[in-house]
């Protein structure tokens, strides 16, 4: 890193993770632990979008609540050409993007040119993670919206009824250096999520909604300062999940997401993500007719004002769902809440309100299990967030 980058990174580090001194960002030497980003299990089922219709996807995966990786769903995105590190560095060189939050919950931002220098050259244990939710509101950064389309499988977006400024944060554009990631979480408000990966590789561990929080969450005893970071989870909790004493009903589904693949995480699933190399991705949370009952119970509890506007719009645009709200038991057990401490869905950085707000972030029976080595040469050029989206 050049001297200008080092100066700015030091300032950002102190703001984004005030609990760490500058000389503690590399105290565990995770940069040298290649097991974290090396060979791992790849168990999650894959489907081919070229021979799977939207209706088939809904009936086989969304409705049953089954995580899956989808291939050839985003092959036509301009992002594959426009989101190379070189082109992003030129086009958005002086634009500032969110890489964390300070102790007051305010965004900590960094210019793209400094972040990319840092991303390619740092040796931090858990590097800063560019995780931007407001890119669609900025005159220059909103051009990113032209580079991708919401996949057909996830085209139903009921929260759009309440308006762009009233709805909770729901989309994140992210660049993750190797070893960055998001801590264990459930996505906010019962929403489901999809993550489209343009370059690099992501390591996922996904657990059933019924998995007890105390089994999955690192404690202060496990990690006094970095307990919410994705890499901490893989160092501390992951080995426990592989031990014979780990309850089989809470077994982990492991996956490696490759460039061009989309991962679908149904609402309620715990998930944790680690960037195995430099990654560029976009992720969105959504409410559809399928997950609406679970989302409604959480919205009416935690966002009462928005719920009134939502219901008002549903009566006009989706009277069938408006009638359904009268039958939903909002006091019933709707499963685990999302974590405000999740790190977007992502963690080295997320947004205050998903990757989780007052709920947590997310990611079974596996039909195929095989070992897939990760080729370090296949690298594509290429804090915890209050609201954690799908990393």
Question: Where do the model's predicted regions map?
Answer:
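N-terminal accessory scaffold of Fe(II)-dependent oxygenases
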Residues: 1-262, 274-391
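Short, charged beta-turn/beta-strand-edge "cap" motif at the junction between a beta-strand
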Residues: 269-271
């Amino acid at each position: 890193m050049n001297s200008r980058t080092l100066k700015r990174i030091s300032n950002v580090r102190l703001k984004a993770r005030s609990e760490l001194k500058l000389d503690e960002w590399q105290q565990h030497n995770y940069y040298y632990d290649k097991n974290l980003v090396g060979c791992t299990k790849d168990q999650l089922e894959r489907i081919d979008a070229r021979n799977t219709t939207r209706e088939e996807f809904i009936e086989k995966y969304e409705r049953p609540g089954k995580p899956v990786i989808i291939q050839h769903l985003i092959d036509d995105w301009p992002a594959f050409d426009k989101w190379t590190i070189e082109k992003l560095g030129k086009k958005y060189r002086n634009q500032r993007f969110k890489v964390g939050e300070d102790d007051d919950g305010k965004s900590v931002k960094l210019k793209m040119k400094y972040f990319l220098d840092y991303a390619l050259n740092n040796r931090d244990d858990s590097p800063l993670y560019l995780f931007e939710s407001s890119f669609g509101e900025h005159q220059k950064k909103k051009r990113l919206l032209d580079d991708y389309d919401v996949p057909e499988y996830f085209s139903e977006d009921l929260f759009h009824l309440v308006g762009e400024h009233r709805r909770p944060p729901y989309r994140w554009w992210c660049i993750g250096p190797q070893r960055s990631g998001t801590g264990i979480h459930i996505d906010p408000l019962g929403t489901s999520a999809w993550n489209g990966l343009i370059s690099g590789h992501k390591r996922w561990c996904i657990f059933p909604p019924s998995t007890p929080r105390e089994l999955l969450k690192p404690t202060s005893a496990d990690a006094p300062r970095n307990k919410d970071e994705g890499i901490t989870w893989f160092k501390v909790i992951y080995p426990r999940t592989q031990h014979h004493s780990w309850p089989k009903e809470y077994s982990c589904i492991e996956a490696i997401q490759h460039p061009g693949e989309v991962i679908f995480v149904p609402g309620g699933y715990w998930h944790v993500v680690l960037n195995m190399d430099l990654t560029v991705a976009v992720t969105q949370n959504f409410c559809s007719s399928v997950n609406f009952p679970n989302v409604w119970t959480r919205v009416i509890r935690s966002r009462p004002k928005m719920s009134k506007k939502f219901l008002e719009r549903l009566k006009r645009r989706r009277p069938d769902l408006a009638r359904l709200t009268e039958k939903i038991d909002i006091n019933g057990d709707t499963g685990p809440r999302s974590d405000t401490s999740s790190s977007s869905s992502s963690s080295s950085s997320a947004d205050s309100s998903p990757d989780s707000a007052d709920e947590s972030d997310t990611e079974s029976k596996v039909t195929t299990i095989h070992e897939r080595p990760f080729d370090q040469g296949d690298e594509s050029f290429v804090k915890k967030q209050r609201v954690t989206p799908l990393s």
